[in-house]
Regions:
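Phosphate-binding site recognition
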Residues: 1-158
Length: 158
């Protein structure tokens, strides 16, 4: 299956002013699928963290925003040696304490890393405990399959 949104991800990857990217969208529109498909297609390595499924990592940002410590923890949890050629996916980021705020520090202290985050629109919007990293992240809205994407997915042309 091919989503037209993947072209936006390629532009993000190649941007000289790349910021952490938050992929927003309603539940079940394919945010996780799109990020993982893009990782397989465009990166040699992917460190995927789902904060909804990993109780321990939900507290990754509780004490500080030390990027080296964070990257080491992600590497240990995922089994991936994280470097600047790795796509770091932080899924269901609204479940991590101070997770959205942490994206600011990737932009300020480690812009060489490729970081994507995702969460439901409602979950991100209602996450009151975080200070929002205005100007430090980019956003991409993902919508359900278009009619043409659906036709392509089921192998039809018309």
């Amino acid at each position: 299956m091919r989503r037209t949104a993947i072209e936006q991800l390629y532009r993000w990857k190649e941007s000289t002013d790349r910021k952490p990217l938050i992929v927003q969208g309603a539940r079940q529109v394919g945010k996780t699928w799109l990020m993982q498909a893009f990782a397989k297609e465009a990166y040699a390595k992917c460190a995927y963290v789902n904060f909804e499924d990993n109780e321990m990592l939900r507290h990754l940002f509780d004490n500080d925003f030390d990027i080296e410590r964070i990257l080491t923890s992600i590497g240990l949890a995922t089994g991936v040696n994280v470097d600047t050629e790795t796509l770091i996916i932080l899924d269901e980021i609204q479940e991590a304490s101070r997770g959205i705020t942490a994206l600011k520090y990737f932009r300020e202290k480690a812009p060489q890393y490729h970081v994507m985050a995702a969460g439901s629109l409602l979950g991100i919007a209602m996450h009151h405990n975080d200070s929002f990293p205005v100007g430090k992240v980019d956003f991409m809205n993902l919508y359900p399959l278009s009619f043409f994407e659906f036709l392509d997915a089921v192998g039809e042309t018309q």
